From Swiss-Prot:
Its EC number is 2.3.1.-. Disulfide bonds: none annotated. GO terms for biological process: fatty acid biosynthetic process. Belongs to the thiolase-like superfamily. Beta-ketoacyl-ACP synthases family. It comes from Rhizobium sp. (strain N33). Proposed to synthesize NOD factor fatty acyl chain. Involved in the synthesis of a highly unsaturated fatty acid moiety, which forms part of a lipo-oligosaccharide that is responsible for host specificity. SUPFAM superfamilies: Thiolase-like. It comes from the Bacteria. GO terms for molecular function: 3-oxoacyl-[acyl-carrier-protein] synthase activity. The chain crosses the membrane at residues 329-348. This is Nodulation protein E.
Amino acid sequence: MDRRVVITGIGGLCGLGTDAPSIWKEMREGRSAIGPIVTSELHGLTGTIGAEIKTLPEHDIDRKQLVTMDRFSLLAVLAAREAMRQAGLSCDERNAYRFGAIVGVGGSGWEAIEASYRALLLNGARRAGVMDVPKAMPSAAAGQVSMSLGLRGPVFGVTSACASANHAIASAVDQIRCGRADVMLAGGSDAPFVFCVVKAWEAMRVIAPDTCRPFSSDRRGLVLGEGAGMAVLESYEHATARGATIIAEIAGIGLSADAFNLVSPAVEGPEAAMRACLADAGLNVQDVDYINAHGTGTKANDRMETEAIKRVFGGHANSMSISSTKSMHAHCLGAASALEMIACVMAIQEGVVPPTANYREPDPDCDLDVTPNVARERKVRVALSNAFAMAGMNAVLAFRQV
């Protein structure tokens, strides 16, 4: 069995907005959410920038469930609920075992872990929180989504650094293609704004001091963000049978590994993932109109990704639109490619390519059309989403107009 898989609902929240429409509106307008972080979880750490969710949307999640959630799980549940509302779906005894969820996370449970560290080592507490372990496990977000919505089909977590959401979506597509499920919720979530995580990223010397400028010659690194993005995936037959509005089709998946270095990228792995994605979708290079680049804003990554795109697409590389929306929502780690999924499907829906914000100076090593600073109207029939994680774990998705 090899069923077509379509998207019928999307949900998200990040520094740009607390639902998918507001996120897309800010992307279209090229607005960046990057600024000073003010959360109390940084315990007085100053001079740190990021793309922070200032206020969570109103919700009716039961307090008993809330106290069992770390922030990354809460964000995933909020995004999943929005996606379900847009899809016009609910889960009940008739379909629960054919309806699952897969959520990718880059890191998990940071709030619970740091709170216990401070309580035990700094403040002399005798015991950790009773819910610290279930709060912190990487699969907690998927489990909380399942419990919140009553999903009893395939439910599990995925963690592969900043390719986590694309890997989660790819895994969900496979569940539907092989007939194990009819409907899946899939995406990613991350909430890295706690003291120890921010300091660890700063120690790597990849954090920009001002903002994220992907593909610009004066780029100085990435910027951290928090957020979640989720999509309702259905078999084409299931969606059409219930009269659902189809947003886009997930036409292809390409996965690969560099087998090279924990932190340095290699061009061959991303090249292989893009080629595999096109082959899986039955697409030619000329069919692709837009690539949402991994585009972290580091010198090495942006240079490598440009070269990989040129290798795969040849002369057509100069005809496509490319952009990195991390310039606006920052690098949301496990949630990054889920938010970029929203950018891809909305580009298809509205015929608008979101820009690479904060772009200032052309780089001869990154000389493709990166849609600098201003969104561009163009017909987008096929969009690719690139996610190239540390340790060389690569996941590329192809979205197609239906």
